[in-house]
């Protein structure tokens, strides 16, 4: 376990950057894909922020704006991992592949909370 909480990562531009990020996974990585213009993203923003604040030090959190990281979003979409935004992805420590261990899409509070409870 790390002594300090890692910063929220916001710059995962493409698939190779995602795979590089997964290689340094200290225990768990949670990535939120969204956009400034996305209404459903705004609906779950405070819920996701609260969960991110409660994360232990061995969890990396990432908030990816699909407009600035469109190559990554496009890659995940072509692999049918994401359908749209918002989407939350969970990767456990030994997963070094782009396919997540858990995923939830949409702005349903119950599904978002259940996702975090499952992942932790």
Where are these regions (language model features)?
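Eukaryotic short linear interaction motifs
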Residues: 39-40, 69-72, 97, 110-113
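Non-catalytic, surface beta->alpha helical segment in thiol-disulfide oxidoreductase systems
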Residues: 83-84, 89-120
């Amino acid at each position: 376990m790390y002594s300090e909480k890692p910063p929220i990562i916001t710059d995962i531009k493409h698939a190779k950057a995602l795979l590089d990020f997964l290689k340094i996974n200290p225990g768990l990585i949670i990535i939120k894909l969204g956009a400034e213009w996305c209404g459903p993203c705004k609906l779950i923003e405070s819920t996701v922020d609260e969960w991110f604040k409660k994360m232990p030090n061995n969890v990396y959190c990432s908030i990816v704006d699909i407009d600035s990281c469109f190559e990554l979003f496009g890659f995940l979409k072509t692999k049918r991992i994401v359908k749209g935004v918002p989407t939350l992805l969970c990767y456990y420590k030994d997963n070094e592949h782009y396919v997540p261990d858990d995923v939830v899409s949409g702005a349903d509070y119950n599904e978002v909370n259940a996702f975090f409870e499952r992942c932790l």
